[in-house]
Amino acid sequence: MWLLQHRAAALFLFAVSFLMPVSHAHSREKTDIKTLVIVSHPYPERSVLTKGLQAAAESLEGVTVRNLETLYGYDTRQINGDAERKMMREHSRVVFIFPTHWFNITPMMKAWLNETWGSVGPGLWQGKEMLIVSTAAGGSATYGPDGRIGVSLADVFLPMKACALHAGMAWLPPLVFEGARSDRLPSYQHQLIERLKQ
């Protein structure tokens, strides 16, 4: 019985992550701002929401998507800081898509920032924009003034805000999905596409 349930769950995850298309109503749309999307998930084989959000971003013209685990695996020493800085210079907005991982960004995303921004002085990315897009399993029972940890999910991203402001970037209000569930993926994709088109 357990094996059948496990296989059914695996088939469902496959169908949701690989077969669920982004709505045709959104295809061929474009963003007016040249956008670099950095995607990371610590367990890509289990990713449903992050893969779905990546697919939504890829459906827009004017968006360049870089999945860190696809490019570099888990070897942080392989991150090419020079190439990543070149990508940053070629875009006006950077978007980070990731699941909230222990109240933080993912390990590969942190390594990417260290390699790419490690020598960034104040104002180096002046005039560019930063947007955080994140999913979190926890909802109001975890986040917010009455939640278990007593801080909002947006507060978890204050270090990223500090990075953006230090580098001279405009900090955009994060797009965060609390209590995230795979059956809500089409809504999350739609919200992301609408934000990227702004």
Residue spans for each PLM region:
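Short, glycine-/small-residue-rich phosphate/pyrophosphate-handling segment
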Residues: 129-172
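Bacterial N-terminal signal peptides that target proteins for export
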Residues: 1-10
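Short loop/turn segments at strand-loop or loop-helix junctions that form parts
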Residues: 39-41, 134-136, 176
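Solvent-exposed loop/turn segments at secondary-structure junctions
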Residues: 101-102, 137-139, 180
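N-terminal beta1-alpha1-beta2 submodule of the flavodoxin-like/Rossmannoid cofactor-binding fold
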Residues: 14-122, 193-197
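Glycine-rich phosphate/pyrophosphate-binding loop and the adjoining helix
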Residues: 33-36, 54-60, 75, 159-198
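Short helix-terminating capping/connector loops at secondary-structure junctions
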Residues: 124-126
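Surface-exposed cleft-lining segments at the edges of enzyme active sites
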Residues: 72-75, 104, 145-149, 177-181
